[in-house]
């Protein structure tokens, strides 16, 4: 007991109810005769072995009951009479310890919202049938209740700017200035915590440093998951909204695909009661993330964990009490461990499903196939054991298909990333691959990047109507021709890559000869030898600065060991986009031979071939420049043009080499 300066004021750590004699009689009829009316509420330190400090938080929460313990763990509660109509007046006096928060019963009508049990104990009700959502997810919404997030824009902006002036009571009061419903009250609290409370990575490793008291959390603005959940619950109670803290297992920081869970709980989150049903929130994961490499926290707001649909929430949250799954039917711990973990970005970026639906995949004949369905076109990439190798990823209008060929037997880690409108790829799925057979006939080039084959993305970048829609092209003689339409103002560049060559940037382009016929572009390809090659396609808008952008590639396959094609002639800057070379296509000419030339050149006055001597080319009626030259005594042969008839300066446009005699 502490006496204040005012002699009429007394601070007592208990709940005092003052009522009339009539009310005493009414009270006597409701009290359990076996109960000890003078017993104080005991500490709820019943979660043995909880690593993240839920037990400590509960010890600080005297005079509260969350209703999320199994029945056998519920402790004896004191009997409290809440109201008796027409039986006199009732005065309730609440006196709190220094670190506790007043409930503001009158201002926010908390007493009307909290539901009592048959004995009059005020506590949130346990979830029941009307709270349960069907499992599996019906794809209707990411939320457990209809929401239009645009209606929260003003409230979110206001709540995120509120600062702590004194204590939690005033903070909640400031937050609720723009809130006019329980949903808006919860939203304001959620936004404030997610934008102001930092996850304390260091304290997570040192239990003695963890902050559990609201005063400590507000002062340092740091805590751990149990602190987030406890603070969220206390703020909701001050705001007059039923809220409980739910402990359990999670697939969060440090989770390994396929791992099992036992022993201590490693996480805590909340359930809030809105519009007659319970809903789930996780303000820890809504506030940001911890970098796995640096172990540093970064604020990165995640809307996904606000009123998450329970059928999605169960993918990474398993509560201690199955009732708090809010699912029908509830899932077992074994199902939780074995189920596919779709990360929040999977759903944030509009994806619907993935196949296989288990986190562990066994290869079949050395191959594993993964497909993803999405609501809209999405960019994907993958990494196998940390490298973008040994797979073929093709984009579809509503998803993607990935074929993976592990290079060795054993266990492999497969990560899949997706990209929406932002410039950053986010991890959305992780699989563990078990490979007991390697198909050595499938040796993909290390430079084969993703995606393979034309798609909606190549159309978006200006390449349409491809001659080859399949990403894999087989050629028996080592040659192929690929064509597609190109939007006006778009330039195309191609290069050939193989593990055994070509090597230099020049040779990567010299096995491809590009022809432009109106709006169609044709790529003539000659392979230097048998094997598998990546034909990369790049584009660039001519009016924009910067480099060419990779769009997609083809996989070229040739099993003919006799293939040994030379490079195409080297072209120079004056070789126009619309020029066309018919012959000779080989970049190496035979020695001591007459060689015919035929080209279509635009905007020139004269053309000639220069070797040991000079041979002019003439323009025929079809618009082709024709002629021939003799390679005797030549090591190199050039095609040259005169663009202006009033000048005498010729420009090099093509260069050939001549075989040694």
Curated annotation (Swiss-Prot):
Q: What is its EC number?
A: 3.4.-.-
Q: Which GO terms describe its biological process?
A: muscle organ development; neuromuscular junction development; proteolysis
Which Pfam families does the protein's record reference? Ig-like_KY (PF23265), Transglut_core (PF01841)
Catalytic center residues: 225, 267, 282
* GO MF, any single term: peptidase activity
Disordered: where is this region? Answer: 116-137
Naming one, the record's GO cellular component terms include: cytoskeleton
Q: Where in the cell is it found?
A: Cytoplasm, Cytoskeleton; Cytoplasm, Myofibril, Sarcomere, Z line
On whether Transmembrane is a keyword of this UniProt record, the answer is: no
Tissue specificity: Specifically expressed in skeletal and cardiac muscle.
Q: Which SUPFAM superfamilies match?
A: Cysteine proteinases
Q: What happens when the gene is disrupted?
A: Mice exhibit a primary degenerative myopathy preceding chronic thoraco-lumbar kyphoscoliosis.
The coiled-coil regions, if any, are none
The alphabetical list of record keywords is: Cytoplasm, Cytoskeleton, Hydrolase, Protease
Report the sequence similarity comment from the record.
Answer: Belongs to the transglutaminase-like superfamily.
Any remaining note in the record? Used as a marker for 'occult' heart disease, as its absence does not cause heart pathology in heart.
On assembly, the entry states: Interacts with IGFN1 and FLNC.
Q: What does this protein do?
A: Probable cytoskeleton-associated protease required for normal muscle growth. Involved in function, maturation and stabilization of the neuromuscular junction. May act by cleaving muscle-specific proteins such as FLNC.
Protein name per the record: Kyphoscoliosis peptidase
Which organism does this sequence originate in?
Mus musculus (Mouse)
Species classification: Eukaryota, Metazoa, Chordata, Craniata, Vertebrata
